């Protein structure tokens, strides 16, 4: 590889973007423990020396990758407008958009799982996580509140807890789908199987918050019937 000095005329911003993009691919496929700085340098066409100039350690670079990905995901999600949709359709669209991010960026699943193993410390080192997620949950809360106001959702839903439940269920096919598909009669590997899972979980979540929920509504949702 051609030697590159810190004094290169390349734009520092472009260099950092290239490093972070390459690191995201490596961390997303190999995890924090398995990724090597040599491979990141090779992928982005820079030297290890230059990477260490910007990031003092592999852990610091990982922290930058996960925090940037998290922020990018939030900014994209809150950029959607749901106010023109009826509450039920807004709810569906919101969660479909969450799932779609993981479909388009499969490396995010590994980054999320890896960061969970490290108890979220890398998020907290680089950003205040809660301040980033507050606008996202507020957007979700508005959908729930509009549904409650029109009588299609139960009132007084804890938006934070319900968002956590919804996120966990909808993204399960990306986080643990390979394992679950191996020993259960479910398909979370193919595009059609993922789409079916996302629709199924959204149906269950809707059944839980609809005023007419009760046993019959939940039973239909468990059977995969749209309610």
Describe each PLM feature range.
Residues 21, 88-117, 134, 160, ...:
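Amphipathic alpha-helical segments that line or abut small-molecule/effector binding pockets
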Residues 18, 22, 26-60, 64-65:
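Helix-turn-helix
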Residues 2-7, 65-94, 131:
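Amphipathic alpha-helical linker/stalk segments
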Residues 20, 62, 66, 70, ...:
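Amphipathic, non-transmembrane alpha-helical scaffold segments
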Residues 104-127, 177-184:
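Amphipathic alpha-helical segments used for helix-helix packing
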Residues 29-33, 84, 105, 150:
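Short coil/turn segments at alpha/beta junctions that flank glycine-rich nucleotide-binding fingerprints
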Residues 89, 128-132, 149-165, 217-222:
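All-alpha amphipathic helical-bundle segments outside canonical DNA-binding/catalytic cores
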Residues 1-3, 97-100, 104, 134-150, ...:
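C-terminal peripheral helix-coil segments that are non-catalytic and often amphipathic
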